[in-house]
Amino acid sequence: NINFLKDLKKILPNFDITIVSSVWENQDELENFKEKYNVKFINILKEKDWTNYISKVKYVTWEENSGFKVPNIFHMWHSILENIKFLEKLNNEKKEIFDFVLRFRTDIICKKGLKFLESEINSLKDNEILFPSNLHWKGLNDSFFITNFSTILGFKDFFTFLDEFIKDNRVFNPEYILYSFISEKNLKIRLINEFDLALIRVEDSKPTKTVFIPFKDKIKMKFAKQKIKLLKFQNKLKQVIK
């Protein structure tokens, strides 16, 4: 959805936006993608075999295979982490300066709230991450987030965390995994005021693994949901006080 990127550029005229992407070596219409999004730096990846990791996933939430697919979560985070390493390489070798890093999927649209984005980014501090104000059901949605360059480098050990997460038979849900990782890293979660997104996709499939949420994960998910509600309330309160 190129319109979302165009909207971002319009609302952030004071930012020099550089598109850096890591894509699969067998990616369809790669040249079209590069031209459409004006990709400045591109990193070609080989797809990894995650079969061994996937076989160890014991529990999932009911959204599995419809809202998310287990193999795709591994592929997604592999590409995100490789892109982070690529950013670091560009910074070290080409002296490219990245003040902030925005991760976003190309199948999202903004429903409202873009007007608050610039001020939220400008007030972003170390160890803080900005998320949209909606689409958080079991933790934190991973389709869009912003942090500064030094903070994103701390994500490089994500798979070490995920390996322990799976060994501990935690429930596998991408939102809950991201929330748990950020909690373990002691990063501060911030919601962009009234910044609502929507995903352009429709799927309807049954889960492939056991749908079950261990008690400790239920508690943490409820805590995450209440935390999101509190952050939304705090944003509204700030607007009233202004």
Model regions: which residues?
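Active-site-proximal specificity loops/subdomain of glycosyltransferases
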Residues: S22-E93
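Short, flexible loop/turn elements at secondary-structure junctions
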Residues: V23-E25, L102-I108, L135, T151
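GT-A fold catalytic core of metal-dependent nucleotide-sugar glycosyltransferases
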Residues: I80-L130
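Catalytic core and acceptor-binding pocket of nucleotide-sugar-dependent glycosyltransferases
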Residues: I73-M76, I84, N91, K95, ...
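Hydrophobic targeting segments
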Residues: I17-I19
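Terminal low-complexity segments of carbohydrate-biosynthetic enzymes
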Residues: I241-K242
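Short, acidic, metal-binding catalytic loop of nucleotide-sugar glycosyltransferases
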Residues: I2-F15
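Short, aromatic/basic amphipathic alpha-helical patches
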Residues: L5, L30-K40, F116-I121, I177-S183
